[in-house]
Amino acid sequence: MLLLLTLLLFAGTVAADFQHNWQVGNEYTYLVRSRTLTSLGDLSDVHTGILIKALLTVQAKDSNVLAAKVWNGQYARVQQSMPDGWETEISDQMLELRDLPISGKPFQIRMKHGLIRDLIVDRDVPTWEVNILKSIVGQLQVDTQGENAVKVNSVQVPTDDEPYASFKAMEDSVGGKCEVLYDIAPLSDFVIHRSPELVPMPTLKGDGRHMEVIKIKNFDNCDQRINYHFGMTDNSRLEPGTNKNGKFFSRSSTSRIVISESLKHFTIQSSVTTSKMMVSPRLYDRQNGLVLSRMNLTLAKMEKTSKPLPMVDNPESTGNLVYIYNNPFSDVEERRVSKTAMNSNQIVSDNSLSSSEEKLKQDILNLRTDISSSSSSISSSEENDFWQPKPTLEDAPQNSLLPNFVGYKGKHIGKSGKVDVINAAKELIFQIANELEDASNIPVHATLEKFMILCNLMRTMNRKQISELESNMQISPNELKPNDKSQVIKQNTWTVFRDAITQTGTGPAFLTIKEWIERGTTKSMEAANIMSKLPKTVRTPTDSYIRSFFELLQNPKVSNEQFLNTAATLSFCEMIHNAQVNKRSIHNNYPVHTFGRLTSKHDNSLYDEYIPFLERELRKAHQEKDSPRIQTYIMALGMIGEPKILSVFEPYLEGKQQMTVFQRTLMVGSLGKLTETNPKLARSVLYKIYLNTMESHEVRCTAVFLLMKTNPPLSMLQRMAEFTKLDTNRQVNSAVKSTIQSLMKLKSPEWKDLAKKARSVNHLLTHHEYDYELSRGYIDEKILENQNIITHMILNYVGSEDSVIPRILYLTWYSSNGDIKVPSTKVLAMISSVKSFMELSLRSVKDRETIISAAEKIAEELKIVPEELVPLEGNLMINNKYALKFFPFDKHILDKLPTLISNYIEAVKEGKFMNVNMLDTYESVHSFPTETGLPFVYTFNVIKLTKTSGTVQAQINPDFAFIVNSNLRLTFSKNVQGRVGFVTPFEHRHFISGIDSNLHVYAPLKISLDVNTPKGNMQWKIWPMKGEEKSRLFHYSVVPFVSNHDILNLRPLSMEKGTRPMIPDDNTSLALPKNEGPFRLNVETAKTNEEMWELIDTEKLTDRLPYPWTMDNERYVKVDMYMNLEGEQKDPVIFSTSFDSKVMTRPDTDSENWTPKMMAVEPTDKQANSKTRRQEMMREAGRGIESAKSYVVDVRVHVPGESESETVLTLAWSESNVESKGRLLGFWRVEMPRSNADYEVCIGSQIMVSPETLLSYDEKMDQKPKMDFNVDIRYGKNCGKGERIDMNGKLRQSPRLKELVGATSIIKDCVEDMKRGNKILRTCQKAVVLSMLLDEVDISMEVPSDALIALYSQGLFSLSEIDNLDVSLDVSNPKNAGKKKIDVRAKLNEYLDKADVIVNTPIMDAHFKDVKLSDFGFSTEDILDTADEDLLINNVFYEDETSCMLDKTRAQTFDGKDYPLRLGPCWHAVMTTYPRINPDNHNEKLHIPKDKSVSVLSRENEAGQKEVKVLLGSDKIKFVPGTTSQPEVFVNGEKIVVSRNKAYQKVEENEIIFEIYKMGDRFIGLTSDKFDVSLALDGERVMLKASEDYRYSVRGLCGNFDHDSTNDFVGPKNCLFRKPEHFVASYALISNQCEGDSLNVAKSLQDHDCIRQERTQQRNVISDSESGRLDTEMSTWGYHHNVNKHCTIHRTQVKETDDKICFTMRPVVSCASGCTAVETKSKPYKFHCMEKNEAAMKLKKRIEKGANPDLSQKPVSTTEELTVPFVCKA
């Protein structure tokens, strides 16, 4: 009672002291003027929108209640040019005014302390009208007393004498309850004089003054935000409806209110609120789409109330001034009112309360309400009453801001009676289905926009309506025959409906898809394709939606189908990540300000059911060794991105459960989502994985790449950079170094911090340069400042041990438009082993050798322990804004491919019809109320169509000759819509300004492909299909527009009469070609659209092609390309190629046939596809080149029609392993019979390098390197009689360079090696290459054409104008004046980075001084293959060349390990391939492929000379040191003789199996292109080279060839030797003809001499705390063990009865295992009880495993006393 009395006294005091702004008994009439317009800003001054005018009457009943009425309302639509801006005054005479359809019913304004707290309206007043009333009444909200002021130090408090104020307040208006900056100041007489409309009744100031109140709203800080948004998943700083969105979006609202008299008692003279919304329509547009609104109230009169407004019938509170949601599907007004609203009991029925007692009662009642609401937790972030109810699976969501939902009087358009949503959807589906068959005109029909309209319409449909629509269409895919052309419209109808349902994204749509799958309507790949898109399209993934998805996932029809199970599982987990785990995505991607959080924070299904289910499935797949399913569940768990997954991955990553390296690598790679949601946690785990040097490089490199996504601290980057100098794994070091150096170059804000750190640690990296085949990370960006676009590309790949092809490739690219990221496109390709793929997948059974080869026998004698082939596993993933596709595979799946391909070929033999359509959308929506109470709507939509229809017929022969005939219509179409506008619900209008762009490609082609692989022929024939002679093949357009759209008219905007495209005044059209041709191009755009015309510039086009979205701007453009044929084209375009080769024989290859000068040869047969010409040119190409092999390519292009032409191009060239000579011949002929135009070009060129290939530097010391070449070009109508260009060139080594090279350390080291008898080790190989450097070029050209000379001279003149070139020109006395000759001389400087170039022409002489090679894209490395510090050049030699040398006393392996060598009389395996273990059968060894059965053996005689055996397949080549300077050669036991002029070749079926030839003075060479090996020897030393195909596939004295020199001493037993002599002896063949030291050492070898190779070892990389367990690791660490530290724990207690299980609502203090209670006490605990069902038992089991679920929000079932420990000790 005392409290009540105190409150009464306080309330009375407040009431007595407060002076009301509204004089009781007075009536105020205000003129209401508002306008809301939209336009494209500077792009056009055309605006479209609506103007409203009305009268507002306000009657002051008492200090807390105002009665009001809006009446005499009128509105007019406008769509016109406003050169003076959107505020241009428009007289009523120029407007078509209509009555505003408002009810005109009176309403109440509830006040408190002079501020508007609530609007009381008639319950029957439409919600759209209520929101407009709020926008009007909101103009009267003036807080001059700081009632809602935020108390901060910066507040400026006004006084009566100095009415200056500045403060911030949290204030509600129709746009939301947001922070408002108040500025109050007196209004000067000058301003009033200049703008008298501000003070329409100046006498009202009395003794006071006129004052101006400025309110600026801060939309970044709001307590109640009203908006609907969808589709911005990748943006971290996005807050829809605010200004935190970079240049993409900005929003402002400013109010100017003029009051008279004083701040405590005043009259509002005028109030104007101006609001502006600016959006980049397509995100990257430079011009903004605008929505501009203004609400203006001006006092018209003030008088005593003569006729009081009637009381409000059926009153209802609307909460506050904030926009209010309603149920768009209800027949009555169901509004969502916040808790602050008064209930019906609080709404006093007497509108004329006047007694102070009643006022006090009301104030106390309000005060009580405020006290209770402030202490209540009802309006938590979990649930707010003003939000719409969460969507159900059966019903469409209540989206109260989107056009189709509020477009008809605030209700969904189906309420209009004019739109039957079912029939309208059906009609749209049939329209689209029919238009898909007129693919050429898809842009004209606006088919893609119709599909978007269909999707939006279906989002308003409930489950029953969708079922009725499906039934009405009478389309069942099970009844469709996919190969029946007569059903093409029905097929299109089904695919349109299917894709529309997929894109709809509502609960009813999902139930439809679920039903399709359960009843088998969609199966396998079609169902998988649908499921893969759902996470991208779902609008409201509520807990019930996800629960239903989970039930579908467990359905056998899904789980038993591999492709469907993979797609569904990954989609389910991606949806969980977006909707439940990733807070950024939860907020940015879904309409949380409309429905609140879609999944309750207290929903533990993710932890109790979803993750455990996936964990069980992973464990089951692991037990069954089902690799595709293992990969699926690894990716699925990683896709969730929740820390809980670490506990699932832990046993596998730490080796407690064995997984393959590939699977562990995928597991680490799947942590990418965790790096986004919890970067610190992910960083810790990834860093520990990286530090484990015993882990495989694939796993570690993947960890490195992901680690960079977590923005590691500087100290961590420093550690990693330093560690590159210590880590022995080149793959990992290469990944770290390349990634850090790539990061250094980035400048964009996103990478700025990490780039700065990378630059600071760069100096700590190892200086070693790594090959590009090793693991690398690249990050590239392109910044387009003028378009506010930054494009990013990330490429990571992990190298292979057994191939140059990476095992893992990850590529992603995305663009940032301001701060808005467009969803990225990611591509991932992984394979466990390239060699396994080659061995097990690409080779057919007949290609595998069945007899034991010589190499296998040697491997058996050496008892080589083979490695098991890595099990073949792999996957391919594509993830973009439309779908996520993941295809895991293993050997068993690949084994099925040949059968599948064979079945497909069999199916298309008869040319069956196909019709495949795919429609996809990417959508983003933002909507919120404007300050005029009308919904603002922004949409960004991308609609894409891919279509293939027609027939394919194929015939394939066993010898890979095949014929394919097809009649196909291929279509790709894309429509991008960026639209800004607002909705007027009372007249079902949507006013829009936007930019639409279209890209359309159509190819209706009849194609015939004939490939004859044995003969090397291929021919394409291409015709346009019949009936398509005038078809549109290409369309591109950008159309800015404004539109006054009737929402009930479900037609594309381009077909609306209210749409006005912004065609520029200087628009012009261009048609090409001017004359008739097979194609016609029409271009339409503005003359001033320079960017469009600049695309003709090849350089700018090339620069923009990688980023095609930057090629357009906002200006109008339209490009169409048509076929322009008069009738059916019966003759095809023919493109044919022929390839042939020829092994040249004597006498053609005799050296005397080589001529020092090459002459262009005119073929005797110039017809297309001439075998005679090909043979002639091959013979000429190989003439005079020893052991040459010639090749020829013959191309023919025939174009029929009016401009018939025949083009022939033939190129022939030769190569030789024996001589350093080469020749190239070319013939080009163009014939156009109808125009009698023929043209020919004949080219002949040759090159010769001397000395020829040398291996030993001592052979080179006295020889001068040089290169001679010449080119002969003849051209004209007949090249035999036409003009000629003759070019001769020489490259030489200057004496200066020779002297410089001779003084380098490389040469000196080689000389020292030669003194010890070692002449071919790597040092001397470098010396040979270094000594062959050429630095002088001299070229002379005979040019008879004056035009060509003039053109060349003009080019020189243009070069001279380049700023960074130092050029001197002499035109007065040119050296070649009067001659038809051009000379070019160039000389490199001593550092080989600059050149002096002198050019002499008949017109001028030019001297280019110190030309930097880098300016022209060349580097020193392009000139050299090696370098030395003496030349100031580094890293030119590849340190890991694929060569192995056995020199006089030392050897070097393939991987560069150097060791002393002494062979003795025993044969030793220098290099041999060996069989592998079949991973599917550990007892079986796989045979070595026939073309990889290679062994090289060597031994020494008493003189220290080396005898060598080479076993290539079934051939045996033996090299025996001879009495002369070169070894004797035996092939299969038969002695052969080779000399400088005579080589030996073994040829089978025009293929050289191997050839033997002389190299230099004393070396013999052997090369086999078939086996990819080569050998050079001189009787004392041997050099062996092998291709990358042998990587990690050989053993012997040359090492294991895995590009890692640390393990080169691997012995036959797969262990490592320490001592070189042990390693050498281990490869001795001791079974026969073996004696001496090698035999003794080999026999004495013990097991301890050979160390077993350490296999990969996993370690503890996930701690207890990181896996979510109780941290027990810290308790035993350190010198001072705190055994009691973790004795006290908290555990949820469980009590079980017969029918219930009860859980403590909060964890209870307990003693840990191994600890006991020292002291106890009793304490009451609340329990929540559940029925004993499956859910309760699952929760119990989870608690028993250590979980402590949060049950604090559950209802209390009972309270019991528990005895709990007070102190626990171990």
UniProtKB/Swiss-Prot annotation:
Q: Which SMART domains match?
A: DUF1943, LPD_N, VWD
Domain annotation VWFD: ranges: 1442-1635
Query: What are the alphabetically sorted keywords of the record?
Result: Disulfide bond, Glycoprotein, Secreted, Signal, Storage protein
One Gene Ontology cellular component term attached to this UniProt record is: extracellular region
The UniProt entry, under SUPFAM superfamilies, shows: Lipovitellin-phosvitin complex, beta-sheet shell regions, Lipovitellin-phosvitin complex, superhelical domain
Q: What induces it?
A: By MRJP1 during the differentiation of honeybee larvae into queens.
Entry-listed glycosylation sites: 296, 1067
Q: What GO molecular function annotations does the UniProt record carry, in alphabetical order?
A: lipid transporter activity; nutrient reservoir activity
UniProt function note: Precursor of the egg-yolk proteins that are sources of nutrients during embryonic development. Involved in the differentiation of honeybee larvae into queens.
Protein name stated in the entry:
Vitellogenin
